[in-house]
């Protein structure tokens, strides 16, 4: 971007970061900021901390929620305080590349190494320090058009290296336009989950180590006041979750009128978890003259609708998976085991005991199931970490990084950890509760065998009534084989488990919550032909939670089965199951 002909681009001064009496105008219409403060107030100097300080402070919540404490990583020594004009290349970041431009796609015409991209010295230095030399396919095909200002709609498997694919062009753009804190936010990256946002923030921190531009993060559960303070000082590259970003756009006086680039990562997941309205509002508030990048593992109708409103006409479409034989990464050995519901827990317990020296992630379908099984396993000296959406952000952050830094151990979690997270050296992915569909399966197993020539294994538990799910996996090009577990290797701890749950009030209460949530999750499965709640054997399911007889729990089937048009009544399931132990018909 350096060697293009120069052209002047005016970036308006962010003079009113703390505009008095005009909060509404500042948020929705930043152009109405008044120059009420001195240059020094507008563009405060933010000290650049040591690497050790960054590691200790960046990720803690109340203090790191001051996760924007590191967000102010800025050097203002080269600021010309009287100059608001920023030099830009002739082809601007939101430039006028024709929508029908055909870019070369053959391997011969693509750069293979980062050093061939003509990146800035500071960016190249950071990439080398991060240990990267060769580009992945999404990086080879995505970075050059993004550097040229093209809008991109990308489809790539998790673990494909897309984080660097969108961060490198963003950082180069900020450097090229000489963004300073007073210019406000030039790049926004939207992520579906807090953990993924923290991970992207970590990559951005490493990539921007030698640049003077500022970076920060705003996520739900973090200290909102600390975030607002950092934003008011000027955050050039902002990573955010949708809900908290919309909150700040509407209620925090900060400058985003100079936005040049919007990145929407894991767009399908953002929409799946219910942020469609927030995303539409965010796009409506942000400046229209910008470059946009949208990445999604699957191209659903909703994703296409979001792409239509967020991208300019004629975006470049990149699909690095279309020619692959399988939908999952190479080096991943995938298997399943078919067992009755009452044998599920003892099989899982035996597996974890046998694999104590491995690094394992176990997926469950609900927060309460994760909570219960974590309490149970830790109580019986099978140490595990747990991660789910009901935890406070501080706990989630600490757990995530503790597991990332561990050489071995077990993390049990909900799908909050299934998307995008780059956890090093995971040996096994265990899907104790089945995924909602093949897409979720692919994202779950994507936590292992990440990177070039990496190996990993996955294991999925299926009930005999659920084997039809294998047909859907085959249609989705997912190769799985049946694993066999010798009976002699299984530790039969069922009777001890039932005694423990019978006498321990705390575990008993937690088990009931887990049992109820499991039924709710099962009732809400999208593949009803495979995961039919009426085929569940209640007595056997209860045994997997440690109950000798099913507890009496009330669930609202109508609420769970939102896709069913019929009104579902409230009914109790419990100590007197119908003949055969099944649910029978819903009322």
Curated annotation (Swiss-Prot):
Subcellular location: Nucleus, Nucleolus
GO biological process assignments: maturation of LSU-rRNA from tricistronic rRNA transcript (SSU-rRNA, 5.8S rRNA, LSU-rRNA); maturation of SSU-rRNA from tricistronic rRNA transcript (SSU-rRNA, 5.8S rRNA, LSU-rRNA); snoRNA release from pre-rRNA
UniProt keyword ATP-binding, yes or no: yes
Keywords for this protein: ATP-binding, Helicase, Hydrolase, Nucleotide-binding, Nucleus, Ribosome biogenesis, RNA-binding, rRNA processing
Residue segments, region Disordered: 1-103, 558-587
Database matches in Gene3D superfamilies: P-loop containing nucleotide triphosphate hydrolases
Binding annotation for ATP: 156-163
Molecular function in Gene Ontology: ATP binding; ATP hydrolysis activity; identical protein binding; RNA binding; RNA helicase activity
Cross-referenced PANTHER family: RNA HELICASE
Written domain comment of the UniProt record: The Q motif is unique to and characteristic of the DEAD box family of RNA helicases and controls ATP binding and hydrolysis.
Quaternary structure and interacting proteins, as annotated: Associates in the nucleolus with the 60S and pre-60S ribosomal subunits.
Protein name: ATP-dependent RNA helicase HAS1
Lineage, highest ranks first: Eukaryota, Fungi, Dikarya, Ascomycota, Pezizomycotina
